[in-house]
Amino acid sequence: MKTRRLVVLAMLVAGTVSAQTLTVGNTYSNPNSSDGNLGAVRTDVELTHPANATGTLDTATFYWSSSGCSAAAKVKVFRRVGDNFTLVAERGPFNINANLMTVTLSPAIPVLQGDLIGLARVANCGNPGAVSPGYDAYYVQVAGDATSFTYSASVVQGNRLQVYATGTATEVVAGVIPSVASNQGRGGAYFRTLVQVLAPFSSSPVSGKFVFRKKGTPGGPADASMPFSVAGGSVESWTDLLNSMGTTGNPGSIDVVLPWGASTPLVGAQVYNDQGNGTTGFREELIPTINHSFAVGTNIFFSGATGYMFGPADANTYRANIAVRSLEAGVEATLRAYHADGTAAGSGQSLRYPPNTWNQDSWAVMTGVALEDGAYVRISVSRGSAIFQVSIVDNITNDPADVVARVLGAVI
């Protein structure tokens, strides 16, 4: 059920999606190497900087090791769903007349946020440029003039592929509600999610959409979504958002998508156990995914970032679950549990999730060791970015308390 009410506030400050260009790929710097020599014809796709919004790409810049190459390079855009890559569009082949090439993509290429840019070497002349070492950047390389392929560790290259494209943005994921539910829990619990959206008084009506990322299923264009519109100065409330979206039965997370340049509304959520005689639960706020800083204190973990999450002080009275929500570049990380005295418990559990994937499981499954009194877990991200959350639940009342982890250290 959705309700609407007018609220009165003395002052409200809302965020705004900054008016910047749609971008994808690595900006140019002086390359010191080339891509791998997999074959005369090969395709490279940059993984770490997916399209930052939905829109159209009209210009691409890339480095080529030799000039004077005829019909040697194609610019390609791929869409990744899970570990499957499918060609969206390609332009070229382009004649190479300089090492640093800027080409017009005509007609412009429509892209979705998260799409990836790549280059195909289609003539035996010159090579795409790269920077070694790649630090936090990497790309995949496959043989041939590819139109589809599957991710595997064997195709990953550790260097920074030098290709970049720009264009016009139309909409963007403004933020993520980390965990939502409308499903049966343990011990007779039934968890639902109340979501509220407040539009600033000074703004025009705010319209957008919710996109549901279901547990264990890599996100993609076919994910369930629902539009919303909130008049200036009012609140719209959905007492069971996933039921309103027709997606009950599985937990997950929610993307809040807005038109490019729109003011970001205030978004709050409450995940609650609907017991029929009152509720228990926890509040969540929208975690912004635009204009955020890769820095200590953020809720978004990035390559080189570390942080910690508490388990319960009493492992008999409470249970603990750990949730991970990867963003557009996916994530590779290690969760390592520690005893209360600071000594390591086990060797750590490695995890890898493709883009826009939400998963939650028990402490034991996620860390590889049993839950115990006073335990805590260290998060270390090696590639990509993600949001991490721990849920501590009372075994008698099923009352959950969730905390979103923050970055406490980083190696950049």
Predicted regions and their residues:
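Context-gated lysine
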Residues: 2, 74-76, 91, 209, ...
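Intrinsically disordered, low-complexity segments enriched in polar/charged small residues
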Residues: 7-10, 47, 84-85, 165, ...
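Sec-dependent, cleavable N-terminal signal peptides
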Residues: 1-21
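Gly/Pro-rich, tryptophan- and cysteine-flecked surface segments typical
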Residues: 168-412
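Positively charged, low-complexity intrinsically disordered regions
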Residues: 5-6, 21, 43, 80-81, ...
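Beta-sheet-rich sandwich/jelly-roll-like modules and their strand-loop junctions
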Residues: 19-96, 100, 104-116, 120-184, ...
